[in-house]
Amino acid sequence: MKNLNFFLAFIFISFISCDNEPVPDSFSFGLENDFKINGEYHSVDNSLKFKITEINDSRCPSDVVCIWAGKTDVKIEVESPVTGTIVLSTYDNSVDIVGNFSFKIIDVLPYPISTKTIQLEDYNVTLKIVELTN
């Protein structure tokens, strides 16, 4: 009987701890979060849903000397609560607003190397998303 009570308590605690694990495609406002292309993401409270639909990387490879450093453009489609499309750039448009949400591009990795082709699915886009108050 003692073993049965221990087993039941263990099962109960396991179920409770599973509820506290973060959902893989969710993010928290005000923090730097990493995102992939074509992933569908939503805020922890489900007040915002979006996906990254394009990444255009024209940065100068780290092992090459260039006149211009280049830039990366990231296209984001916001699906709810309002719909809209924004393009954030590592060069001249690092912040944009859709509805009452501010999107800021922090980084795009990996950084290009002249001898390696980066596949779109290998990119990691770091964004900071803030819910604006009225």
Question: Where are these predicted regions, by residue range?
Answer:
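Sec-dependent N-terminal signal peptides
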Residues: 5-14
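Bacterial Sec-dependent N-terminal signal peptides
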Residues: 13-34
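Short acidic-hydrophobic surface loop/beta-edge motif
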Residues: 37-45, 94-99
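Short polybasic amphipathic segments
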Residues: 39, 72-78, 125-130
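Cysteine-centric segments in proteins
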Residues: 44, 50-53, 58, 64-65, ...
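Mature extracytoplasmic domains of secretory-pathway proteins
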Residues: 48-94
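Short Fe-S-cluster ligation motifs
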Residues: 90-112
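C-terminal partner/receptor-binding element of secreted or periplasmic proteins
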Residues: 110-134
